[in-house]
Regions:
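Outer-membrane beta-barrel transmembrane domain signature
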Residues: 57, 120-212
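Repeated loop/turn-to-beta-strand initiation elements of outer-membrane beta-barrel proteins
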Residues: 14, 46-49, 64, 109-112, ...
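Outer-membrane beta-barrel translocator domains and adjoining extracellular loop/strand segments
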Residues: 28-32, 78-84, 116, 125-129, ...
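Residues that define the transmembrane beta-barrel architecture of outer-membrane proteins
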Residues: 12, 32-38, 62, 93-99, ...
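Transmembrane beta-barrel strands of outer-membrane/channel proteins
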Residues: 14-22, 53, 68-72, 114-118, ...
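Extracellular loop and loop/strand-boundary signature of outer-membrane beta-barrel proteins
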Residues: 24-26, 85-89, 115-120, 172-177
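Short glycine/proline- and aromatic-enriched beta-strand/turn motifs that initiate or cap beta-hairpins
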Residues: 3-49, 54
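Structural signature of outer-membrane beta-barrel channels/translocons
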Residues: 40-45, 59, 104-108, 136-138, ...
């Protein structure tokens, strides 16, 4: 997956820009799309708003940050967007909302981040988690950010997005399927370039190993 962003820093903690992301979809014969998305963010002393995520810092110092957060879970499925006749018989899956905690430890050794969130929009009430380590490397105007991590999703969330119910199996001809808990390791690399005092640009790639 990759993303590009250009942002203009405003006063009072505000920033704005435009970004885009693209990722191969795990659904069979599915149309993958990338759309430009305007982004707005605000960084206050305690409250922040970063695109589809809102947070409030409970602890914030040079070495550690702990926040309570609510954000969009950016996964969905539209049966009509699949070219496979059987998959087109499945029910749609919508975006979800999740809420929980984000934690981040930082120092000269890099940054260690962790999160745990629960789905609250009526899509099974599943739990997701993430643990990752990153080490920013400064080279002139460019900052490289390699990251290694692992994501967790429980059976309830996986079943909503990837399961095949008995009713769906009956009308599609697919086998009924109920996934379990999953761990998904990933690697990513991002590069951020400071163009001038007001503008910066960022691009990144990420690879994940999906569970069977």
């Amino acid at each position: 997956a990759s993303a590009q962003e250009a942002s203009a820093q405003k006063g009072n903690g505000w920033s704005a820009g435009i970004g885009a992301a693209w990722s191969p979809n795990p659904y069979k014969s599915y149309k993958n799309r990338a759309w430009p998305v305007p982004t707005v963010a605000y960084e206050g002393k305690s409250f922040y708003w970063r695109g589809p995520a809102f947070g409030y810092r409970l602890v914030n110092n040079e070495a550690f940050e702990l926040s309570v957060v609510a954000s969009l879970y950016p996964q969905r499925f539209r049966a009509k967007d699949s070219r496979d006749a059987q998959v087109r018989q499945l029910d749609d899956r919508d975006f979800s909302g999740v809420a929980g905690f984000d934690a981040r430890w930082r120092g000269d050794w890099g940054a260690l981040s962790g999160s745990a969130k629960k789905e609250f929009t009526g899509h099974g009430g599943g739990i997701i988690g993430d643990v990752n380590y990153s080490y920013p490397i400064q080279q002139g105007r460019v900052t490289w950010i390699p990251t290694v991590g692992v994501e967790y999703a429980d059976a309830e969330l996986n079943d909503y997005y990837y399961g095949v119910s008995t009713a769906e199996a009956a009308r599609s001809g697919l086998s009924a399927y109920r996934p379990g808990n999953t761990l998904t390791p990933y690697l990513s690399m991002a590069a951020r370039m400071q163009l001038n005092e007001r503008w910066s640009a960022m691009v990144g790639v990420r690879t994940s190993r999906l569970a069977d």
